[in-house]
Amino acid sequence: MCHIILLGMNHKTAPVEMRERLAVACRQEVNPLRLLPRLENVDELLFLSTCNRVEFLFTCRDRDGGLREVTALLRTYLGLDSTEGVENHVYAFRGMEAVRHVFRVASSLDSMVVGEPQILGQLKSAYREATEWRTVKVILNRLLHKTFSVAKRVRSETCIGSNAVSISYAAVELAKKIFGSLQDKRVLLIGAGEMAELAAEHLLAQGVRHMVVANRTLERAVDLAKRFRAETTPFDHILNALKNTDIVLSSTGAPEPILKYNDVRARMRERRNKPLFFIDIAVPRDIDPKINEIDNVYLYDIDDLQGVIDLNREERKREAERAEHIIAGETLKFQEWMATLNVVPTIVALREKAETIRRSELQRTLSHLPHMSEKDRLAVEALTEAIVKKLLHDPIVFLKKKADRSTKDMYVDYTQQLFNLADGDDGEEAPAVTVQMASAGNDGTLLKTFEPDKESPWRKS
């Protein structure tokens, strides 16, 4: 039996320390796909790695053996030794749960910021690498193509990516509206907490190439900068950094403003009054409101963003529900396709036998018609192909319709006996494909995950 399994960790399950390992591993460009030939139980493999997520999507015959091998692969990728556990930070989905999860990831329903577009491009890159390494075959090829079409449906039929639902996202969207493209803008992030992290995620998604992080604790600034390909500057050098900055986004926990009117005014002279935009999303505020009075300085605070956020949150929730409905329907369609794989060996055998008979009879007939022109020979061959195709159409459609029913085996057996398909083979039927339906709540949250057996790598000693 063939199982579809997804094993991974993301921003919801892994602490900052583990996610930092993800960022380091991602930059090393070490591709685990090259190790597939060493995995005895894994048939197909796709590998997705971002700053906030690492996932292995694979098919295998032996579920526990496959999980054990891919867990070891995850350890290797993260550079963990045998004493460092990952079990508490890893999730695993199988069957249609895995399919549904991939659909949700591609549709950005499982992202740190619901609706962000970056993850789909990352998943496409992962699939492109897998095809180059030839680690995907029939099942994962079909699944990934379906995944991309599902994500496209979600984008086109919902407004999931249209409305900002976090202060950080709204701040970046505001900057985008002000400047248009952010690719050539220099951004100074003050603070390295969760809001700064989210802002960095959005800025990166918008193509920002010049980002500087400042934080009272330099180590935190360095950690954030590593994960988002940014630079750092000491906290007491913030004023100096203003000289070459277009956008300042501040989100510290300081009890009083860290940027004062007189300080900013002095730096504006050095900038020759080049426009400078401040987005203050801290509470209490990081930036003296009075700086808005300085020429060519534009200040926006959290109150300017919050009203938009409140309106958009309900709209995004409704759009997410619509997206989940699309995903549920597409998951069922994929389940139906998977079920047809159970009858594929019989269908293939039926077509091959019909083709063998067609060619044999055609050759025998044409041998008695030596004076027939090449054009007429081709016409007769096309005729026989069309007849065979039409004769097989109804029984093949019938088998596919019965593929996901409990009586499937009976109909497969009848077909094999009726057309004498077992004649001359070894009597063994091709491996079946195990399909399991996902359990999910109305809000799209996971209700069940992989339950380990006694020999599973997840069980603690």
From Swiss-Prot:
InterPro entries: 4pyrrol_synth_GluRdtase, 4pyrrol_synth_GluRdtase_dimer, 4pyrrol_synth_GluRdtase_N, GluRdtase_CS, GluRdtase_dimer_dom_sf, GluRdtase_N_sf, NAD(P)-bd_dom_sf, Shikm_DH/Glu-tRNA_Rdtase. Keywords: NADP, Oxidoreductase, Porphyrin biosynthesis. Substrate binds at T50, C51, N52, R53, S111, E116, P117, Q118, Q122. It comes from the Bacteria. Its EC number is 1.2.1.70. GO terms for molecular function: glutamyl-tRNA reductase activity; NADP binding. Gene3D superfamilies: Glutamyl-tRNA reductase, N-terminal domain, NAD(P)-binding Rossmann-like Domain. Pfam families: GlutR_dimer, GlutR_N, Shikimate_DH. The keyword ATP-binding does not apply. One of its GO terms (biological process) is protoporphyrinogen IX biosynthetic process from glutamate. It catalyses: (S)-4-amino-5-oxopentanoate + tRNA(Glu) + NADP(+) = L-glutamyl-tRNA(Glu) + NADPH + H(+). Belongs to the glutamyl-tRNA reductase family. NCBIfam families: hemA, PRK00045.1-3. Homodimer. This is Glutamyl-tRNA reductase. It comes from Syntrophobacter fumaroxidans (strain DSM 10017 / MPOB).
